[in-house]
Amino acid sequence: MKKKQIEFENELRSMLATALEKDISQEERNALNIAEKALDNSEYLPKIILNLRKALTPLAINRTLNHDLSELYKFITSSKASNKNLGGGLIMSWGRLF
């Protein structure tokens, strides 16, 4: 695993642990627990981040996301958290046709 990815994963783990100690809604707690378990199972990091974003974005849009999760939400929506593959899957599947 790349050094930056390890650092990012460690920071995410730390933020998840801190957030789970806060007084947050059950919906938020469930999303964070799922992400934490996925990290423990060494699942694909971009997928974990995507699932966490899917769970928290509606809460952020509706302004019901707990204030204690704002730093975590900013962290997972930052550009360094996104997958930079930029269509690699399309190239892999359609590349043979050209």
Swiss-Prot record:
Is Metal-binding found in the keyword set?
A: no
**GO BP annotations listed:** bacteriocin immunity
What's a Pfam family in this record? EntA_Immun
Q: Which domain of life is it from?
A: Bacteria
List the InterPro entries: LciA_Immunity-like
Q: Does the keyword Isomerase apply?
A: no
- UniProt keywords, alphabetically: Bacteriocin immunity, Plasmid
Summary of the function given for this chain in its UniProt record: Imparts immunity to lactococcin-A to naturally sensitive host strains.
- Recorded protein name is Lactococcin-A immunity protein
Organism, by scientific name, is Lactococcus lactis subsp. lactis
